[in-house]
């Protein structure tokens, strides 16, 4: 069987058992707290939790059968967070960042008997895996460690029957496992249950006793190929476990693992070779392309260490890294996870850059990585069609990243190699020795060389060289990185950055746990701008004063939206509220002017009634910008593609800023299209609705953002049914209230991240009016209508260019004449001619050109010219070969002269430049110091 046939036979087998075959879900998980989709069961979590009825037959792209049974092959990424296999990829033959998980599920339908017997039938009867080489694990709690529940007698009995039917001893083929290996939990609370794994003995011998010893021993010759999880309990908050009303089955099988074993063992028949997932033909197109590009051959060697590797070992590691990482990055980009600087996007950037680094080890030129996309599509495009559909954008994103990182990599590698060489060449002595600027050597039970954290941080901060790349390169050379020192340097940089921003940081004055226990403020400002409230607290910091109320119509700064300002009236006295922020206890802090402190103290407002009023003009302006931002997000995704994701926002009354993932600058046409789309929706007067729903019941296509903390109940902002986002901010009621929208700037803020700045409503009107006023002034100056301005400017610029050309010709002619005059005044000595002069000239380039012309006319000699250029003196010196041979050095002459006029200079023996801050001394210094005679021109 081919890999594709193994995958298809799995799906067809379960289709025959009444399972609905569903497509793989996106690698971009629906849960914002999850980095990537990392297991087949992720998309079924709402069903397991009871938040959604089983309805898989109605899912888009499904091959329908029963709603309570499902099977699929799921793309998964495990790199970063809890599951992180990145650093192992390439060094063995079974770790991957991206892999497929084959699985079947029962939602309150069949249970252990069907799951186990069907699984056994597939792998032994359909695929032909020898039964004698298989072992099953069952849950057996270790009560000394307070493992939950009881021994899984039901699973044991089913397995015992299976093995007896094969003529095998259950006592040998069934292995007991504790909570660590054989009890699955979704979290500290919630659905859970025992699991039963199937392990495959890959030793050359099929000795059952020897095979049993290797189960869960962490050796590649006996590995788990399929896990059956039986979800039958609920873990309660008090530590107890109660039975679920509906029992479920969740299974997962590593596709590459099974396909690799099949290929290695020639159809599960020859167990003489070490297993390797990379033997699966799903990797063949990639290996073929890498061999073509590198002119090297993959031999499948596997290292037993991380340093001192042989040439072929390094080649084979690089092949595996590139094959794996190309699959991972391509699939991620196809699912709109682009390389970036934060969260999951940064993980993809790390993986791509790690791949590029290993490409350098194969001497592959910049641009090679995007050529690996085609073989990924060849091997996976049939089962994951989004790879075919988005092949062009995948290549373009990778190309942009590769070109950007290529510049970083060259400089970073050079500096790393220099530092590593200094450290490795240093002589180890007893105790500790320092290698200045690089690191230390310690001799404690052996020699350890540490790259200093400051050195590593300089690579990272100045040259953008990722620290994990430095760690990888260091390990290969037997070095370690002082990560404690690196972390300290990073913290200091962050502290400096925060200080430089001079951003107001609000710290609640309440000490200890009181802030956490404080009563959260009730926000009632979505539909009203005024309210009566009770003062609960006065909060003071070193320089700020805040009031806390039981409820408020003031929106606190969050989600990129600036806080409201307005007024509060207490006992007839009115105070201006300058800003509103929220503390970690959920209290809204209403900032007053520091000058109010005495009045507030006399008033003693705690417990008193207050009348609150938000500035309606400011709130409307902020809301316009917030709703416009949602439209911008929609328009960008429509114009550029669904890979566009929000990466940061700011909404104030003056303007909005929207940061988003994209790999290249927007063209003027794209900017115009985004602006047109937004304004078209403003004109269509679409309804803007906000409503609350359960997170798992939000409408399909609703955008949520990684890193945000969403509760069970979320707020959806829906604009016309085409833009839906989870959002807690304030908005207009209809799009027409935005009025007008204008983009004012588009720029890059980081590799893979762009920024749009825009204005809406009155701010947009003011922007247009300002530009109209400027245009009217220009048309008046040009004596032309607005439609003729461009043509008139083109004509003026062409005329200017012609005049500049004539001026340059005149200046060259004048310079040639001046050069003749200077050369004619030269003095001769010892077979050389000398010209030393101060000249009146416009710029440095003209001075250099004049000096060169004079020397050319002299033949052999020394030319020293000075000029006052603005408030600085400038010098050039030229020496001919004969002059240099006679001991004259241009660099030395310039250095001495520059020092005397308050500056510095230097250069080569034949040409040098310099200058100083005091042009008034120039003529005297030249007269006293320079060879030859002084002229002034």
Curated annotation (Swiss-Prot):
Cellular compartments annotated: Cytoplasm
A biological process from GO: alanyl-tRNA aminoacylation
Classification via PROSITE patterns: AA_TRNA_LIGASE_II_ALA (PS50860)
Entry-linked InterPro entries: aa-tRNA-synth_II/BPL/LPL, Ala-tRNA-lgiase_IIc, Ala-tRNA-ligase_IIc_anticod-bd, Ala-tRNA-synth_IIc_core, Ala-tRNA-synth_IIc_N, Ala-tRNA_ligase, Ala_tRNA_ligase_euk/bac, DHHA1_dom
GO molecular function list: alanine-tRNA ligase activity; aminoacyl-tRNA deacylase activity; ATP binding; tRNA binding; zinc ion binding
Top EC class, one word: ligase
Necessary cofactors: Zn(2+)
GO CC field: cytoplasm
Catalyzed reaction equations: tRNA(Ala) + L-alanine + ATP = L-alanyl-tRNA(Ala) + AMP + diphosphate
Superkingdom of origin: Bacteria
EC number: 6.1.1.7
Residues that coordinate or bind Zn(2+): 626, 630, 727, 731
Alphabetical UniProt keywords: Aminoacyl-tRNA synthetase, ATP-binding, Cytoplasm, Ligase, Metal-binding, Nucleotide-binding, Protein biosynthesis, RNA-binding, tRNA-binding, Zinc
UniProt cofactor note: Binds 1 zinc ion per subunit.
Annotated function: Catalyzes the attachment of alanine to tRNA(Ala) in a two-step reaction: alanine is first activated by ATP to form Ala-AMP and then transferred to the acceptor end of tRNA(Ala). Also edits incorrectly charged Ser-tRNA(Ala) and Gly-tRNA(Ala) via its editing domain.
UniProt family annotation: Belongs to the class-II aminoacyl-tRNA synthetase family.
Free-text note regarding domains: Consists of three domains; the N-terminal catalytic domain, the editing domain and the C-terminal C-Ala domain. The editing domain removes incorrectly charged amino acids, while the C-Ala domain, along with tRNA(Ala), serves as a bridge to cooperatively bring together the editing and aminoacylation centers thus stimulating deacylation of misacylated tRNAs.
Protein's name in the database: Alanine--tRNA ligase
Originating organism: Opitutus terrae (strain DSM 11246 / JCM 15787 / PB90-1)
Lineage of origin: Bacteria, Pseudomonadati, Verrucomicrobiota, Opitutia, Opitutales
């Amino acid at each position: 069987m081919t890999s594709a046939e193994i995958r298809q036979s799995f799906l067809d087998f379960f289709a025959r058992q009444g399972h609905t075959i569903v497509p793989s879900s996106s690698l971009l998980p629906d849960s914002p707290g999850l980095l990537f989709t990392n297991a087949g069961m992720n998309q079924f979590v709402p069903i397991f939790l009871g938040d959604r009825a089983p309805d898989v037959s109605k899912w888009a792209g499904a091959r329908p059968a029963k709603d309570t049974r499902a099977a699929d092959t799921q793309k998964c990424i495990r790199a970063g967070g809890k599951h992180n296999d990145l650093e192992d990829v390439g060094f063995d033959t079974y770790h991957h960042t991206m892999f497929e998980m084959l699985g079947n599920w029962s939602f309150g339908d069949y249970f252990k008997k069907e799951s186990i017997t069907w699984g056994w039938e597939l792998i032994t009867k359909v695929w032909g895996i020898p039964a004698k080489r298989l072992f099953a694990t069952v849950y057996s709690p270790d009560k000394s460690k307070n493992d939950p529940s009881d021994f899984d007698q039901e699973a044991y009995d089913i397995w015992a029957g299976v093995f007896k039917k094969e003529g095998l001893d259950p006592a040998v083929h069934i292995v007991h496992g504790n909570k660590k290996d054989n009890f699955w939990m979704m979290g500290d609370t919630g659905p859970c249950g025992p699991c039963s794994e199937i392990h495959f003995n890959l030793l050359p011998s099929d000795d059952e006793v020897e095979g049993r010893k290797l189960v869960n021993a962490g050796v590649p010759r006996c590995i788990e190929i399929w896990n059956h999880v039986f979800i039958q309990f609920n873990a309660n908050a008090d530590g107890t476990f109660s039975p679920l009303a509906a029992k479920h089955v969740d299974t997962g099988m590593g596709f590459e693992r099974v396909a690799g074993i099949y290929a290695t063992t020639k159809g599960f028949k020859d167990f003489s070779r070490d297993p390797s997932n990379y033997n699966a033909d799903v990797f063949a197109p990639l290996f073929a392309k890498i061999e073509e590009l590198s002119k090297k051959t993959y031999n499948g060697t596997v290292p037993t260490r991380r340093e001192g590797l042989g040439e072929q070992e390094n080649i084979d590691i690089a092949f595996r890294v590139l094959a794996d990482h190309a699959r991972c990055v391509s699939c991620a980009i196809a699912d709109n996870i682009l390389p970036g600087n934060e969260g999951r996007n940064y993980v993809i950037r790390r993986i791509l850059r790690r791949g590029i680094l290993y490409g350098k080890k194969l001497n592959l030129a910049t641009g090679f990585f995007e050529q690996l996309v085609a073989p990924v599509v060849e091997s996976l495009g049939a089962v994951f069609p989004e790879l075919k559909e988005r092949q062009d954008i995948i290549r373009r994103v990778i190309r942009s990243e590769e070109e950007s990182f290529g510049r970083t990599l060259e400089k970073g590698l050079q500096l790393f190699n220099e530092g590593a060489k200094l450290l490795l060449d240093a002589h180890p002595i007893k105790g500790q020795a320092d290698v200045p600027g690089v690191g230390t050597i310690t001799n404690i039970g052996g020699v350890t060389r540490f790259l200093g954290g400051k050195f590593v941080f300089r690579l990272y901060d100045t040259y953008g060289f990722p620290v994990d790349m430095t760690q990888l390169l260091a390990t290969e050379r037997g070095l370690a990185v002082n990560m404690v020192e690196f972390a300290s340097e990073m913290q200091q940089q962050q502290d400096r950055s925060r200080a430089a921003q001079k951003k107001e940081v609000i710290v609640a004055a309440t000490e200890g746990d009181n802030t956490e226990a404080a009563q959260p403020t009730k926000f009632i400002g979505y539909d009203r701008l005024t309210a009566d409230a009770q003062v609960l607290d006065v909060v003071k910091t070193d320089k700020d004063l805040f009031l806390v109320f039981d409820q408020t119509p003031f929106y606190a700064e969050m989600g990129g939206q600036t806080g409201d300002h307005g007024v509060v009236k207490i006992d007839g006295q009115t105070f201006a509220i300058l800003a509103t922020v929220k503390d970690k206890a959920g209290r809204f802090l209403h900032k007053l002017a520091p000058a109010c402190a005495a009045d507030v103290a006399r008033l003693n407002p705690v417990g008193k009634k207050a009348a609150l009023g938000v500035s309606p003009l400011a709130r409307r302006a902020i809301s316009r910008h917030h709703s416009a931002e949602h439209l911008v997000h929609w328009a960008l995704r429509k114009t550029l593609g669904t890979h566009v994701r929000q990466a940061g926002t700011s909404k104030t009354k003056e303007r909005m800023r929207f940061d988003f993932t994209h790999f290249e600058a927007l063209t003027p046409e794209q900017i115009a299209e985004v602006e047109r789309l937004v304004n078209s929706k403003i004109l269509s007067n679409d309804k803007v609705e906000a409503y609350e729903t359960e997170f798992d019941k939000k409408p399909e296509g609703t955008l949520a953002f990684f890193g945000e903390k969403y509760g069970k109940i979320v707020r959806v902002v829906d604009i016309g049914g085409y833009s839906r986002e989870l959002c807690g901010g304030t908005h207009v009621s209809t799009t027409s209230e935005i009025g007008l929208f204008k983009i004012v700037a588009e720029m890059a803020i980081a590799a893979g991240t762009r920024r749009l700045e825009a204005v809406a409503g009155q701010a947009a009107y003011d922007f247009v009016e300002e530009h109209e006023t400027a245009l009217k002034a220009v048309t008046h100056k040009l004596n032309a209508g607005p439609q003729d301005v461009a043509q008139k400017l083109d004509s003026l610029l062409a005329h200017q260019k012609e005049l500049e050309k004539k001026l340059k010709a005149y200046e060259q002619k004048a310079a040639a004449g001046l050069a003749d005059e200077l050369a004619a005044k030269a003095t001769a000595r010892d077979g050389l001619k000398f010209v030393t002069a101060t000249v009146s000239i416009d710029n440095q380039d003209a001075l250099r050109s004049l000096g060169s012309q004079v020397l050319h006319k002299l033949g052999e000699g020394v030319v020293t010219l000075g000029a006052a250029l603005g408030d600085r003196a400038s010098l050039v010196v030229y020496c001919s070969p004969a002059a240099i041979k006679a001991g004259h050095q241009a660099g030395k002459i310039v250095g001495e002269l520059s020092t005397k006029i308050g500056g510095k200079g230097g250069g080569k023996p034949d040409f040098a430049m310099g200058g100083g801050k005091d042009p008034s001394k120039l003529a005297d210094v030249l007269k006293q110091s320079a060879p030859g005679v002084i002229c002034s021109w």
